[in-house]
Amino acid sequence: PYDGLSSDRMWSFETGDLDVLRRHIPEAAVVTPVIFNWTDFKHRDCKTQGTVKGVSPDYVAVENPKLSHGRYIQQADLRDCRKVCVLGEKIASQLFPNESNPVGKYIEMQGIYLQVVGISSLTSNVGVGGPASRTVYMPYTTLQRLLGRGDHFDMLALTTRPGHTVSSIQRKIELEIKKLHRIDPSDQQALMSINVESMF
């Protein structure tokens, strides 16, 4: 036990964490939330499976979508919890095999209809939750609501300002998160981090 709390308690990121980390980690250029879930997608008779990823507009700094059609997630989509999405190229070709540009059409996910606003041509296999081509991106606020997640999200993604690396501030970030969630600073199991920089 630490700070009077059970040693096996569950915790998750909350939206309020973002503002605290942005203030306390000035080396970070972007601090952005991510929610992900493996699920089924459908358009008429076409079905496929993949990752749905709830993101904010500044997630482009983490994983550049390289749009071939349409647009990315915008601030108004977050604010209004809009049911819009950006399709990875593989998902788009499976759900719309006879269409080169399905922007404006709708896909079904867990009984909810999402309007396609963009197509990502990013083919990188580096990504949490699966390859970009098999991912559907949508506003994280909308996905929070659809999944009944309240104010919580799965992962924090960040980039650093020029002159800094994620490796150089990783320990500082981890300690800040542990302080926010009353986690023992020496606990190596409570927090998992993936440094994509080190993969290149």
Write out the residue ranges for each language-model feature:
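Peri-transmembrane interface segments
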Residues: I173, D184-F200
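Helix N-cap / beta->alpha transition motif
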Residues: E14, V136-P139, N195
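Hydrophobic, regular-secondary-structure patches
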Residues: P1-T51, D58-A61, S93-Q94, Q144-R145, ...
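A short coil-to-beta-strand element that immediately follows conserved catalytic motifs
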Residues: V30-P33, F153, S186-L191
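Structural beta->alpha junctions
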Residues: Y2-W11, P26, K42-T48, I119-T123, ...
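Mid-to-C-terminal secondary-structure elements
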Residues: K53, P57-D77, C81-S186
